């Protein structure tokens, strides 16, 4: 067998980074393109990629190391933005290609901090690196083969663009590597010359590189000889298995798998001598009954292959199921805990033929308060949407909508938010307390973080305190809390009949002492996650829940009180009432973005918001979904022009919602 002889000298266009398991040239944005024997076009500034750096190598150390050869223009060790730790690679810029070539020839595969480094010309053309043209996979390498040895072994077959031996976290060879040539012809030449040859006393395999998806697809099409059989009777023996499968061809082995005590695990493997016999046995025996048990017989697969196949089947089934039930399957939530599958079916039976009906439950069997109902016709489902959404059942308003997969909902939300224009936020107003005029309870509550509260006279009506206009700050802190029914002062004067406002001097109101002011977050999360009536508050002062970081807000009302108030309120007032009850609950889950998340949740249907107030689990899920959307939208918004203030992240986030029905 031929022995591969590595040349004693070489002029290497050196290796680069492994991408998806393949050795590829490296690139860096914003750095001039270099060139050399690898065919990379040279620019005025020649940039070298330096890989496999020790994590302790600094910019200054890299600069000094490369300056020993030629004068360096600049260097950069790439680091993690969050932790500032080295990523194990960097870039060195020279003023001309001659200096860069000298550095490559002298320093490539040299040791820095006890670790061999790799150098290649930096290329910004990612298409060439990712195409896979000329890329080879080499396996069965001896542990002593490193990047330099592999490069020397293949350098006689053509111009090498990159070369890499895969290593573990300890730096030890994994026994395989990748070599990429500049042309496909050079790669084919290497396969013909080196495949099956011996390198460092081991026969190596050289073949075209295939990505994981391509390898798995090719494996599915390959013939097989090993057969997996399950659902065996506990009494089935190896000999019986061999006799049954032996009818279809020659068998090299047959075994029933057993545990440590020798008890059958009810599955086994049969290995045929040729794939045609194995395929015939699978076709004949799969699904056949033995000892009143139906056998499953199929190709023996690795765990990764089984998981991939199951994933494909699930995705295909979900896709087919989604198409099959489009417009027929309804999602119902805010169900009472006592509702069973039968009760849910009875509730919707009057609208048409129900093909399936299920209440979702946790592992302990407790209802999750939601379920699914599928009808035989789209017209029946449409009737349910029109008549049952918002209907009170068991003291709760039902939420009914067309069922959607999670991926579809998320895609819909992302598409919606990307088209929404940023909301305009008013500028900063005068530094003075603002009172809401007109009827009690007509103030607009805006859920944005503000400073300490001004004087806030309590107003009867819908159980909330008027708030500041966004951007305003109070001129002072503290003030008396008026009792219910007590008339609050008007700012600066009063109107007599239809005449003009007359100025009146008002008595200054005493400030509250610091020890009288509420401390920390004054609201409470109702017991069990449900909105329960609050107990009476002692004293003549009206307590105001107050957060040192946000606007003041009132204690959440019970479900009954809230439903009554909503029934008598205008749409604008309904939003404020829901916001007052929702904000404290959101703040306990995510205090940093509570204002933005609350605003997003308020864009949903009223029945769904009421469900969130009743169900901590549903609220947690929606808050998590809202936070994901905030993060995703914040990333593209940061790329906008600095001069376009309306496109700033804060403006974009202020305009978001997670209403599935917009």
From Swiss-Prot:
Any single biological process term in GO: regulation of translation
Gene3D superfamilies with a match to the protein in the record? 3.30.70.330, c-terminal domain of poly(a) binding protein
Composition bias type Low complexity, residue spans: 480-489, 506-518
Task: Return the similarity comment.
Answer: Belongs to the polyadenylate-binding protein type-1 family.
Mind telling me what this protein is named?
A: Polyadenylate-binding protein 4
Record's note on what induces expression: By potyvirus TuMV infection.
Q: Kindly list the places in or outside the cell where this protein is found, as annotated in its UniProt entry.
A: Cytoplasm; Nucleus
Which residue ranges are recorded for the region named Disordered? Answer: 1-23, 480-518, 634-662
Q: Which GO terms describe its molecular function?
A: mRNA binding
The record makes one more remark, namely:
A.thaliana contains 8 PABP genes.
Q: What Pfam families does UniProt report for this protein, alphabetically? A: MLLE, RRM_1
This entry carries the following GO cellular component terms, namely: cytosol; nucleus; vacuole
Which InterPro entries has this protein been placed in?
Nucleotide-bd_a/b_plait_sf, PABP-dom, PABP_1234, PABP_HYD_C, RBD_domain_sf, RRM2_I_PABPs, RRM_dom, RRM_dom_euk
Q: How does it assemble?
A: Interacts with ERD15/CID1. Interacts with Turnip mosaic virus (TuMV) VPg-Pro.
Chief location bin: cytoplasm
Query: What function does the entry list?
Result: Binds the poly(A) tail of mRNA. Appears to be an important mediator of the multiple roles of the poly(A) tail in mRNA biogenesis, stability and translation. During infection with potyvirus TuMV, acts as a potential integral component of the viral replicase complex that could play an important role in the regulation of potyviral RNA-dependent RNA polymerase (RdRp).
What ranges does the record list as Polar residues composition bias? 634-649
Residue ranges occupied by any PABC domain in the UniProt entry: 558-635
Keywords from the UniProt entry: Cytoplasm, Host-virus interaction, Nucleus, Repeat, RNA-binding, Translation regulation
């Amino acid at each position: 067998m031929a022995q591969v002889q590595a040349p004693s000298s070489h002029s290497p266009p050196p290796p680069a980074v492994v991408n998806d398991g393949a050795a590829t040239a490296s690139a860096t944005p914003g750095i001039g393109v270099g060139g050399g024997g690898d065919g990379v076009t040279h620019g005025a500034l020649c940039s070298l990629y330096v890989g496999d750096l020790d994590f302790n190598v600094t910019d200054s150390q890299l600069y000094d190391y490369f300056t020993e050869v030629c004068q360096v223009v600049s260097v950069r060790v790439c680091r993690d933005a969050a932790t500032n730790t080295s990523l194990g690679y960097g870039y060195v810029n020279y003023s001309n290609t001659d200096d860069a070539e000298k550095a490559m020839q002298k320093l490539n595969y040299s040791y820095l901090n006890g670790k061999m480094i790799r150098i290649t010309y930096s290329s910004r053309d990612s298409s060439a690196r990712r195409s896979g043209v000329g890329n080879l996979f080499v396996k069965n390498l001896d542990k002593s083969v490193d990047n330099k040895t592999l490069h020397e072994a293949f350098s006689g077959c053509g111009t090498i663009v990159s070369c890499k031996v895969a290593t573990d976290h300890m730096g030890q060879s994994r026994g395989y590597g990748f070599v990429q040539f500049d042309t496909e012809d050079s790669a084919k030449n290497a396969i013909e010359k080196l495949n099956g040859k011996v390198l460092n006393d081991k026969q190596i395999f050289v073949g075209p590189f295939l990505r994981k998806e391509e390898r798995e697809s090719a494996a599915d099409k390959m013939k097989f000889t090993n057969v997996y059989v399950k659902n065996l009777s506990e009494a089935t023996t190896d000999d019986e298995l061999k006799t049954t499968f032996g009818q279809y061809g020659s068998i090299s082995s047959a075994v029933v798998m057993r545990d440590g005590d020798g008890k059958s695990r009810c599955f086994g493997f049969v290995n045929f001598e040729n794939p045609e016999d194995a395929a015939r046995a699978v076709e004949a025996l799969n699904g056949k009954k033995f000892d009143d048990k139906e056998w499953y017989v199929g190709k023996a697969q690795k765990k990764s292959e089984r998981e991939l196949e199951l994933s494909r089947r699930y995705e295909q089934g979900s896709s087919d199921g989604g198409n099959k039930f489009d417009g027929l399957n309804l999602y119902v939530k805010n169900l009472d805990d006592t509702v069973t599958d039968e009760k849910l079916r009875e509730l919707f039976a009057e609208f048409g033929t129900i093909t399936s009906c299920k209440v979702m439950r946790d592992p302990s069997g407790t209802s999750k308060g939601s379920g699914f109902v599928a009808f035989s016709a789209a017209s029946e489902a449409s009737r349910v949407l029109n008549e049952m959404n918002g209907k009170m059942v068991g003291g709760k308003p039902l939420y009914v909508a067309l069922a959607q997969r999670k991926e579809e909902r998320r895609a819909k939300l992302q598409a919606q938010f990307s088209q929404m224009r940023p909301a305009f936020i008013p500028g900063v107003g005068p530094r003075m307390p603002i009172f809401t005029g007109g009827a009690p309870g007509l103030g607009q509550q805006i859920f944005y973080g503000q400073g300490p509260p001004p004087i806030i006279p309590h107003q009867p009506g819908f159980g909330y305190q008027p708030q500041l206009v966004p951007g305003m700050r109070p001129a002072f802190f503290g003030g008396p809390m008026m009792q219910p029914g007590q008339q609050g002062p008007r700012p600066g004067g009063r109107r007599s009949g239809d005449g003009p406002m007359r100025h009146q001097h008002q008595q200054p109101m005493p400030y509250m002492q610091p020890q009288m002011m509420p401390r920390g977050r004054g609201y409470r999360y109702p017991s069990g996650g449900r909105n329960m009536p609050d107990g009476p508050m002692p004293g003549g002062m009206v307590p105001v829940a107050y957060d040192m970081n946000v606007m003041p807000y009132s204690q959440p009302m019970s479900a009954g009180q809230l439903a009554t108030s909503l029934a008598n309120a205008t749409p604008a007032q309904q939003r404020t009432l829901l916001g007052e009850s929702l904000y404290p609950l959101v703040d306990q889950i995510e205090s940093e973005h509570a204002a933005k998340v609350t605003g997003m949740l308020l864009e949903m249907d009223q029945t769904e918001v009421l469900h969130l107030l009743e169900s901590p689990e549903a609220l947690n899920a929606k808050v998590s979904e809202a936070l994901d959307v905030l993060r995703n939208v914040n990333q593209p918004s940061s790329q906008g022009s600095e001069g376009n203030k309306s496109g700033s992240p804060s403006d974009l986030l202020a305009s978001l919602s997670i209403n599935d029905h917009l």
